[in-house]
Amino acid sequence: MGSRRRTRQGLSIHVESVLGKGISMQIETVAKEGFLPVRVHPTDAGADLRADIPEPVTLQPRESTFFNTGIEVAIPEGYFGALAIRSSLACKHGLMLANSLGIIDSCYRGPVKAKLVNIGRRPYTINPGDRIAQLLIIPCVHATFIQVDELPESDRGTGGFGSTGAQ
């Protein structure tokens, strides 16, 4: 992943990108256990975040609740954080993020939380320290929106919602 060094505000993590460029991001752990985001493999896109809860929480089918992750982040300007569900929780147990994908702006400094919803048919229990979500740090491009009277033509046109695979 990169180098770690303690700062007064928390932890500063230096992340090396595939292109060899790195960014540093400060993380403050507010959990008793001090859960840090962890990449299981060095090339993983997302870093796992853990449930900062005092006791197990069981989500019944169609039930949702917020989970603290025990961290606050200072995402560098020019980037944003994307919070996604871990694929194993979605595919094996029917858990999803209530907002599908959480966006964390670089100016946000509060606790990172994940609202999980059980869309499965069985109750599922989250235990303290379970890995519940992934944090991705992504470059942010700010577009200038220009209102026009008519959009230019394209090969695809107005086809959408599976139209390119239609027989």
Stretches with model-predicted labels:
Residues 2-167:
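DUTPase catalytic domain/fold
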